Amino acid sequence: MTFSKQLFPFVFFLLFLVSLRHASNPNNCSSSSSRPLRCGPLEVPIRFPFCNHARFNLHCTDLNKTVLELPMSGTFLVRDIDYRRQKIYINDPNCLAKRLLTFNISGSPFSPHFDILYTFLSCPNEVVLPSWYPSIPCLSNSTSSFFATSNYSLAQSMLPSCQIVKRLHVPATSPFGETRFSSDLNNQSLLLEWALPDCRAKCLGATKKTGTIYNSNIFSCSFSFLYDSRELFINGNLSSGVLVLVISLSAVTVFVFPTCIAIRLYDSERFDSAIAAATVMQQPREVMARRGLDQSTIETFKKMELGESRRLSGTNGIVCPICLSEYASKETVRFIPECDHCFHVECIDVWLKIHGSCPLCRNSCA
């Protein structure tokens, strides 16, 4: 019998007692017992579930700014977090409109609170437009100007002089769309919410920090899930907490010890071999999930050299959704099978070698 098997019941028992101790301590969940974590003096407080939770990726930048990392869209500046309503406001001060063209919250625990459908257009600069049609400066260039509106009728009225680049859903802060072109899209925040884990039924305080938060490290703080302290100390009644503790210790004696003895008698070789087999079976799936396409497969996708008109089939616009540059004549574009979305060859080839799916609709190309 190995030393680890002999040690396991003792460690299990200690962890159980420690859990009871933290569950019966009402100060562990008190937001006033310690100062909340922050990236900087004026930044938002960091509390559960943004403390040491795998899917809530909150970081500090070198400038002590709080940023949220979304798996499919990158990092965004955090403007505010409403813990009671479980909402977070994010923004990109550089060019939010550009980030929206490829915005995707797949793989994250967040969802839009208000979902507004916006239309993005590109108009040649030689087209004379009214002065009250504000363009988006960070997307515009010397040859064309970009516009955005949630009024689709207004967008259609600008055709055929202008081209619709993309229509997409924006997680807005208000359920009401605009009747004109958006003049401050870059100054707005995106409003996201999360349903699980539900922090509203728990206290909001974080009790412990490891690492140095002001050196751009990831947050790590503890939070007790085992019990709510209010269940153990109702109206200051200490006897109920003691009663729960006594019952729990009795349960340890009756149920936990026999279980530990059974585990110690379990065949270690069968246990280890089962774990090894599970590990071997799991590794190929993880590798395959991260694998892109090889060049020979990518070359089988249809290519086309653009003519002077630069016209493309289907819903494809005149702008490459990856690099956001307008297509030029004599350039070569590649089409994705099934969805028929197209991109610059040099843009989509690099993407497919990493992701193996369409950047717009996420359909698998394998």
UniProtKB/Swiss-Prot annotation:
It comes from the Eukaryota. Residues 1-23 form the signal peptide. The keyword S-adenosyl-L-methionine does not apply. Keywords: Membrane, Metal-binding, Signal, Transferase, Transmembrane, Transmembrane helix, Ubl conjugation pathway, Zinc, Zinc-finger. GO terms for molecular function: polysaccharide binding; transferase activity; zinc ion binding. The keyword Membrane applies. One of its GO terms (biological process) is protein ubiquitination. Disulfide bonds: none annotated. Pathway: Protein modification; protein ubiquitination. It holds the Pfam family zf-RING_2. One of its GO terms (cellular component) is membrane. It is found in: Membrane. InterPro entries: ATL20-22-like (IPR046948), WAK_GUB (IPR025287), Znf_RING (IPR001841), Znf_RING/FYVE/PHD (IPR013083). PROSITE patterns: ZF_RING_2 (PS50089). The chain crosses the membrane at residues 243-263. It catalyses: S-ubiquitinyl-[E2 ubiquitin-conjugating enzyme]-L-cysteine + [acceptor protein]-L-lysine = [E2 ubiquitin-conjugating enzyme]-L-cysteine + N(6)-ubiquitinyl-[acceptor protein]-L-lysine. Belongs to the RING-type zinc finger family. ATL subfamily. The RING-type zinc finger domain mediates binding to an E2 ubiquitin-conjugating enzyme. This is Putative RING-H2 finger protein ATL21C. It comes from Arabidopsis thaliana (Mouse-ear cress). The gene is ATL21C.
